[in-house]
């Protein structure tokens, strides 16, 4: 389940009405769920591929900053927690749903051979990158089934040294590396990928791009990365 924050009660009510108009069923959060998440209101719904999302407002903020055991500072604030890549079955319908129903903005695209996701040879499928805040993308989708309902999640820190130290800990503890250190082409992030116990990948990186929607033009990337990111490599 992935949560998305809206401004206030009026914004959440507008989202309810928009979901109803689009024929998307949703349910209200229970008092226990509101207390657990420390929010004032939330609604929960599923996309056409059974990925679960929540919209909420009125989150309770701590007055003390989070200090991790390794003193890494995460890049959050108006960029949100990071990004998530979810599995879908139809990339055309997914683009329509996330942009027209949920209001995400297309930031970038990348085409892949259809056989990469089990489709007929010679066909093409699209990996799309969508945004709702200054972060280059907060949501992306890949037209490929995934039992965990998550392809990967990304967390960003503000220093390259913290990425390097995290990579050293991954190797020290024998966690399976899914992709080596590299710099992505679309959001320019320097990162690596590690396999989580839940079966999805965790991307850990720094130096991600931010965008200004008044000037941004959606693009197509022709490669995953400028360098590195050897998937399956150690």
At which residue positions do the language-model features occur?
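A structural feature that tracks compact, well-ordered secondary-structure segments
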Residues: 1-3, 54-56, 96-99, 107, ...
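Vicinal oxygen chelate
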Residues: 1-77, 80-89, 116, 128-130, 145-171, 174-234, ...
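N-terminal beta-strand motif that seeds the catalytic metal site of vicinal oxygen chelate
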Residues: 1-2, 58-93, 105-107, 148-155, ...
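Residue-level signal for secondary-structure boundary sites
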Residues: 10-12, 138, 163, 202, ...
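Core segments of cupin and vicinal oxygen chelate
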Residues: 86-137
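A compositional/structural signature marking long, glycine- and acidic/polar-rich segments
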Residues: 119-185
């Amino acid at each position: 389940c992935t949560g998305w924050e809206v401004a206030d009660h009026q914004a959440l009510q507008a989202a309810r009405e928009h979901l109803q108009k689009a024929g998307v069923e949703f349910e209200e959060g229970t008092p226990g769920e509101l207390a657990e998440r420390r929010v004032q209101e939330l609604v929960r719904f599923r996309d056409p591929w059974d990925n679960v999302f929540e919209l909420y407002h009125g989150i309770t903020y701590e007055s003390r900053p989070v200090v991790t055991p390794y003193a890494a500072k995460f890049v959050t604030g108006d960029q949100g927690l990071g990004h998530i890549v979810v599995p879908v079955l139809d990339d055309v319908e997914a683009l329509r749903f996330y942009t027209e129903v949920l209001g995400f903005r297309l930031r970038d695209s990348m085409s892949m051979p259809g056989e990469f996701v089990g489709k007929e040879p010679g066909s093409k499928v699209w990996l799309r990158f969508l945004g709702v805040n200054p972060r280059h993308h907060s949501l992306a989708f890949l037209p490929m089934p995934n039992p965990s309902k998550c392809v990967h999640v990304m967390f960003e820190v503000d220093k390259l040294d913290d990425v390097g130290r995290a990579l050293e800990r991954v190797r020290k503890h024998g966690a399976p590396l899914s992709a080596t250190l590299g710099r992505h082409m679309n959001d320019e992030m320097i990162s690596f990928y590690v396999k989580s116990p839940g079966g999805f990948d965790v991307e850990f990186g720094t130096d991600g791009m931010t965008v200004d929607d008044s000037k941004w033009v959606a693009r197509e990337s022709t490669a995953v990365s400028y360098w590195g990111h050897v998937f399956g490599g150690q």
